[in-house]
Amino acid sequence: LQALTTLVQGLEEMEEPVVLVFFGDHLPYLGDNQLAYAELGFTARAEWDALTSYETPYVIWANDAAAQALDWEAAVASLDLPEDGRLSASFLGAAVLELTGRTGESPWFDFLNQLRRELPVVQKQAYQLADGTVTDQLTEEQAAKIAKWRQWSYYKLMYKEID
């Protein structure tokens, strides 16, 4: 935490606009339903849903120069992030590009931003809808979008030059 504080303090002093994205890693597996965490009092949640194990804390921060250049409050509001802040890590980069005004440059990232507005959290066992509902059932349209996302992800990784 001290290292992050030192980094932010240094970036605050810069006249150049800077946006910092910092994120951690999900919790390791410690028994069915993460029983060890509950027994240790590590989680404040009464129930452990299928997404909790994969939560990754993240921070998106801007120095004053970036906040002014981007109209930060309006830019953050336009992201339409869920109230609970949950967002799949695979959507974080696209959200940052949108936050910094770089929409329309890539059909891939535009697709990711469209998908994250509908399904901000995608995990193999569960999904979180935009209203915060956690489900393992998708509509046909949502399932088709997830299939497209997975296929496009594969081809983007393997072939790099696909639109």
What positions do the PLM features span?
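Solvent-exposed soluble domains appended to multi-pass membrane proteins
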Residues: 1-163
